Design a protein with these regions (language model features):
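Conserved NAD(P)H cofactor-binding loop of Rossmann-fold oxidoreductase domains
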Residues: 81-86
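Residue(s) in the substrate-gating loop at a strand-loop-helix junction
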Residues: 133
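The beta1-alpha1 cofactor-binding region of Rossmann-like NAD(H)/NADP(H)-dependent oxidoreductases
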Residues: 34-35, 55-67, 95
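Substrate-binding pocket helix/loop in short-chain dehydrogenase/reductase
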Residues: 89-91, 97-102
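A short, exposed helix-loop element centered on a Lys and neighboring polar residues
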Residues: 113-114
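Conserved glycine-rich Rossmann-like NAD(P)H-binding loop of the short-chain dehydrogenase/reductase
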Residues: 23-39
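Conserved glycine-rich cofactor-binding loop
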Residues: 9-11
Length: 143
């Protein structure tokens, strides 16, 4: 089985990749940093015999989300995990960074879910996990 994990270069995404590799799943690791993805791949392959493909791509760009879907097929499990946050006084935070955050944290999830779900429905098989931050439910001060 093939699992595609976005935000796989660190944190929850990296940890999920390690756990799923231990269970024998083949992985497609996605993140902006090819260098970090390569380190994750090497670390996983030290102890696991699975196939790992890395894809370095910025999911804040809608076209890149579509490109990822066109490039990576036959996904059994999609883990939408890419994301980042920003905090500070609203009038002082950077608008471009906020728009990139919205595109990564919301738009990319929507696009990838829509595209991969269509594939999964066609083969009548598949799972999608959307990872979210508690900040979406209980934002902290100045977020």
């Amino acid at each position: 089985m093939k699992v595609l994990i976005t935000g796989a270069s660190s944190g929850i995404g990296r940890d999920m990749a390690e756990i799923l590799a231990q269970k024998g799943y083949n992985l497609v690791l996605v993140s902006r940093s090819e260098e970090k993805l390569q380190k994750v791949k090497e670390n996983i392959l030290k102890n696991n015999k699975v196939d790992i493909e890395i894809v370095s791509i910025d999911l804040s760009n809608e076209q890149n989300c579509k490109e990822l879907h066109n490039r990576v097929k036959d996904v059994d499990i999609l883990v939408n995990n890419a994301g980042f946050g920003d905090c500070g006084e609203f009038t002082k935070t950077d608008l471009e960074k906020e728009l990139k955050m919205i595109n990564t944290n919301i738009v990319a999830y929507h696009i990838l879910t829509k595209l991969y779900l269509k594939d999964m429905k066609e083969k009548n098989s598949g799972k999608i996990l959307n990872v979210a931050s508690i900040a979406g439910f209980m934002p902290g001060p100045l977020m």
